[in-house]
Amino acid sequence: MAVKAKAKKAAVKKAPARRKKKGLTKRDVLKKCKQLSNWGKWGKNDQLGVLNYITQEDIVEASKLIKRGKVFRLGLNLDENGPQNGLFGGRWNPMHHMMATGTDAVQGIQEPLVGMRYADDFINLPTQCASQWDALAHVFVGDQMWNGYPAKLVDARGAHKNGIEHFADKMVGRGVLLDVARYKKKARLADGYAITATDLDRTAKMQGVEIRRGDFVIINTGQMADCLDKGDWGGYGGGDAPGLSFHTVDWIYEKQISGICSDTWGIEVRPNETVDGTNQPWHWVTIPCIGIVHGEIWYLRELVEDCAKDGVYEFFLCAPPLVITRGTGSPINPQAIK
């Protein structure tokens, strides 16, 4: 009786295991939030965050940086020609409306009513549509905001904790421009370029300036100037942009600066460095956990040119917000004085 030979099983070559894509994830972001949290550092009732680093003595010293009396405006005009395009949160550019005009006056309409001739107007705008400060109520991590306050304390009436009004007499001190674009020998950094802590340190070294506790650090990427030169904002409002890498959060925490500002829409690099779709991860750490205020959409052209000319990259900065009760941000016109 013939014995049938057992068929040999064909060797099946296993496909190599797929490697998980490496990169920044929400889990990494939340871990960094916990690691760099300043909650409770200035007491359980604090609503100022790292603005607490600025002392009265610091302000006096900063005032001594005024040598020439030269003032640089760092705010954009509030008008219909701003950078908003509705891509993020439906923000629009300022709308200016007249309530009383010279046309009314010369037609004799006003005097019978109020006994004088005059003009009056109002503006309709999102608080963060142009050059602005973010309040510490602007960004949440989970269900909490700065210092552990519940996010639900920001309701239809505004921010009952961490509102912008708490900054009313705080936004003055030493300003430092870090012209990263110039350090990289570029008029404008490319969209998607992630500025590293090494870039920041080397820019400061090139400029001969030291970053100190309580400083307001202003980053120039050249993006805004490029848009203004072209007469086209393009995707500036929420699109791709050069900006700070997520990993600069450690630099910000360790330097103990009090404000971080930029000529871009959102300071951090876009597209973001996360691989799982976590949006604006740098914001998650900096505002609600470290407690640092953001100055966004700052106009830097003349200041950048002057600093390059005289080699002085430090100045007195005065940038108070509008005292908007329970506001989550405020339009501003910062002043750098040298």
Can you annotate each of these PLM segments?
Residues 2-338:
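Active-/binding-site microenvironments in catalytic and ligand-binding cores
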